[in-house]
């Protein structure tokens, strides 16, 4: 990610992230309450240094059901303390006694029932509590924090999306060139996600570099904030009014997650995608649906304090946005 453009400038400080699991706390918010009855057993878990898939498998084994009958809203960081819901499909069966469930690093917080499966993506967002160790209080860092609070940060996909050392992206490029054949369903999904995340990042970086991240262009596709509704900024629109709405954070400029029937909105998008036709072809071949994503993201309820250990941050992000993309604007990280 080093080559991606910063919204501010490259940070001047270096800090430590995830020295301890307690330095990175994530609390999931589904956006709905459990129904209290139904064929699914819903289990809220606090995990410390645990992989989501590993915990899901252990819960399924304890309940005596296949792992495929487990559901969760999303994968969480391993080296962290995370809270999230799992659901187990158990129609007509009693709720297991999870007081008997034992797994290092896992604490059962709540058990109830629900009438629908918790699916990947059925997530409103996440609350974060992050400690950046060795970050020093100074004028530059305070300005960066205030700028993020006011203007947001680039909504980049970060390293987690691309796998260790960018492995998922490398494999996607090899797949697109016909060098490998990927049969494993999970790997196919990871590689496709990495490929279109890379295109998105490059488009966002180019707009910021060209000073176009706060300027609405003809044919831009805009998103109503807090929704998944989009509309074109065609020549009939009042661009002065659109710019006012953008400044008021009522609307957001988007960039594409390439796929079938992708709508290329601006010259910036066209230029980047034209250089990666093999990836676009792969998306069509795999029938990936195209989507849009805001190029900038606003951290909600952002607050901070300097303590002897470093800088402590708390904020909320909608599903799909990365806390490490925000941190990237503040400090260089040594993990």
UniProtKB/Swiss-Prot annotation:
GO molecular function annotations of the record: RNA binding; tRNA pseudouridine(13) synthase activity
Domain of life according to the entry: Bacteria
Pfam families: TruD
Root EC class: isomerase
Keyword tRNA processing: yes
Keywords recorded for this protein, A-Z: Isomerase, tRNA processing
Record has Amino-acid biosynthesis as a keyword: no
Annotated GO CC locations: cytosol
Active site per the UniProt annotation: 77 (nucleophile)
Official protein name in the record: tRNA pseudouridine synthase D
Record organism: Histophilus somni (strain 129Pt) (Haemophilus somnus)
Recorded name of the encoding gene: truD
